[in-house]
């Protein structure tokens, strides 16, 4: 499917669209599962309205065998649907993990220390975990709510109205859950990221912290950050858990209300005894997806926020375009009026440097600490992009080279060697 002119396609959206056939399969299985969910209601209706009045054992045996077969089919379909959703999450991860890892590596070279660290990888885990959970199944089941309500109305108008009122209450609770859980969940995830960044920074600088006696103060700062995270996570969990508990209670109240309405109709000879049980089972099933959606709403909110962060990140750092295939450099290094600003900074620390170095020659760069020697070297090997000017090898600018190809011809030893440490 081609994108419309002027419309920018999302990499996340493309990865999800690649699973379109799997989602269609999940939708078809959800259709069959929800039709099979009618088995219990119809079974009870037949038991009370046919088997008991006729006292027919063969009819009872036939109904039990038929219902058992339908329940087995429903269980198998539910199992397959769950496994397909797990594989959709895995497929999305496989399509994006290399790209997300690339952004984790490249982002510090663009924004310096003010980056998201490993958060993009955690975001991808959040999206995959939600897609692999029971949450998406609940959303696939929600569109079948009107069918169940229509059957309740077919039993009797009062039963249908009772189920409809319960549905309105639970859907309202779902909307309230969305508005009340969005901010606490976002706050909790931000606090978790800050806590993890502080722990990672402390680990990288362990020698300095111990040598200068700062480990106690950093531990105190981390404990304060952790307490804020725990408090925020508790608020988010309280909102989701509280509304989820209310939803469960309301579903049980609704089930009892349907039983009471059914009993009233039987007493007034407006319905049969089977309608009491069948209506109760059907109304409970109608609202089960709403109940399940509320229970998984916290995970949905977290996955949605992770999705938005990943989308912004991948748009900020587009994928590398295949560079021009060039011959191995062998003649000359040219630096043309290069000025350098460190990533995430505004101050120029190397300005208008120009020199040429032919093959076989060497050059030493000396100067006081902080004068920009390391910054110049980072630009010479392509780690940092110059603010102005060009660095060329055999006439080709460094950004025309593939880093994988160029790296074979460059030796680079940074001040802090931490690779695979």
Task: Label the predicted regions.
Residues 66-78, 166-169, 240-254, 273-295:
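Hydrophobic alpha-helical segments in the permease module
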Residues 86, 214, 238, 286-313, ...:
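Cytosolic ends of transmembrane helices, especially the final helix of ABC transmembrane type-1 domains
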Residues 16-18, 109-110, 123-131, 135, ...:
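An intracellular "coupling" helix at the cytosolic face of ABC transporter transmembrane type-1 domains
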Residues 26, 44, 102-147, 204:
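Juxtamembrane loop-to-helix connectors within ABC transporter transmembrane domains
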Residues 1-38, 53, 57-61, 81, ...:
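Membrane-integrated ABC transporters
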Residues 30, 63-70, 137-187, 260-271, ...:
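Transmembrane helices of ABC transporter permease
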Residues 2-9, 86-129, 196-197, 212-232, ...:
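Extended non-transmembrane interhelical loops and adjacent amphipathic helices
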Residues 327-421:
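ABC-type nucleotide-binding domain
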